Amino acid sequence: MNSFKKFLNKKRVQNHFKKSGEGVRLSSGESSSQPSAHAGAAQGGQIDRVAAADIAAQAAFKRMQKNEPQQNAGKRRIQMIAKRELEEERRQVEDLNISGTSSLQQPDREQHLEHSSAISRVLYTSELLGEHHIRSKADLLEDIKNFLSDQISEADDENDKVIAAVLMLYSLNKKHPKETAIETICKYCQNILEHPGEDKYKSIRLGNKAFQERVASVVGGRAFLEAVGFTEKSEGEDKFLVFTKPSDVHLVEALEALKDGQAVPIKVARNLEIFKLKEGQKPKAPKLADDFYNLSTAELKAEQRNKEMQVERMLTLRTKEMRQKDEQMTNYRYKYTLIRVRLPGNLLMQGVFGCHEPFSAVRVFVASTLSDALSTSEFTLRDAASQLVEDESASLAQLSLAPAALLHVVFAENLSDYGQIVADEHIEIIQELEASD
């Protein structure tokens, strides 16, 4: 995995210096302004851990109940009703899969959002292209594809070409086609390693149906083969990929990279906006984008499984900790949350967060927008009821701050001597908050 981190870090540094332009003498007094876009933490890791812990707790509880008497008739009747309702919902999900889920599976649905000016749209950034490269998800994935393709064709380091191809495979394909391609490519390379003297294992006919369906149709599949030493050659009307390297030792390391591959980390961009409120104006709950609610087919199935687990929970004795986890799971259907923070001076800032980011990410976000004079000032974040968050490691979903929330900044000291609230680089983006927002 270190090879992927090294590759990402190297390309991030290269991108940084490309965008920095010409050097500036330290004595010249010139400096570059900081951008106003902020990126969120990568999402998703907490769901699996919570779900796994919950299932383990249920299994342990069932073992404790082995010797309890059988359920009475009333309890069995409740189970029958619940199961019948779940079957009806399952049929509805299946109907969606057959007739109407294509609209939910559009990879570029971020491009068709219709909502108020409170949220322009959900945007993303990546570790590979840098936090300042902010796009819709579809556009960002296309940019990642183009960047990695350039690396494969232009890189002098053979290992960089392999890593770039692996990143393409893991970042730009769905799970099943990706796994099928990786399995097939591994077989090609393993055959060469296991049978070094047999030329038949070093040649792949491009017209072969299995190759076309399993490898050629997957983004990065052929690129990986070419990166490890396969070259296109013609024999009559047929075309082949032929392994032409004199040595196959490098295939061992390439296979390890392929099996242990990872996707380019993509994060939701903060999309910072700052509003100036009129005297007495109160911000309303914003209208949210479709992305905050739309669920894919896989997410619908996950919701179905959650409902089945809920029925099981209703029919078993739950500890306080188990009930708290149940409440947390109900928020996982939201992908993002819009956090608005009220600042002194009738200012209102807002940013987009992943629901599974910790509350501490909001504190970092607020601190990063404050002026130099306030950058070291102590402050607290309170909700509408003036309640403090005690555990800032808790996720925004766990704190019921999804799909939108309004917080207030309270400074520990008097601000009369500090003047400007937000940093200079953010002054120009301040705008009036429309009444509808």
Swiss-Prot record:
Domain PUB: 179-251
Matches recorded under Pfam families: PUB
GO annotation, cellular component aspect: cytoplasm
Gene3D superfamilies given in the database record: 1.20.58.2190, Phosphatidylinositol 3-kinase Catalytic Subunit, Chain A, domain 1
Comp. bias regions, Basic residues: 7-18
Region entry Disordered, spans: 1-45, 89-109
Phenotypic consequence of gene deletion: Reduced lifespan. Prolonged expression of the lysosomal protein glo-1 12 hours after starvation.
Annotated UBX domain residues: 332-409
Coiled coil: none
Induction: Up-regulated in response to starvation (at protein level).
Tissue expression per record: Expressed in the pharynx and some head neurons.
Function: Probably acts as an adapter for ATPase cdc-48.1 and/or cdc-48.2, conferring substrate specificity. Involved in the lysosomal clearance of cellular material in diet restricted conditions.
PANTHER family: UBX DOMAIN-CONTAINING PROTEIN 6 (PTHR23153:SF38), UBX-RELATED (PTHR23153)
Assembly and binders: Interacts with cdc-48.1 (via N-terminus) and cdc-48.2 (via N-terminus).
Protein name, UniProt field: UBX domain-containing protein 6
Organism: Caenorhabditis elegans
Gene: ubxn-6
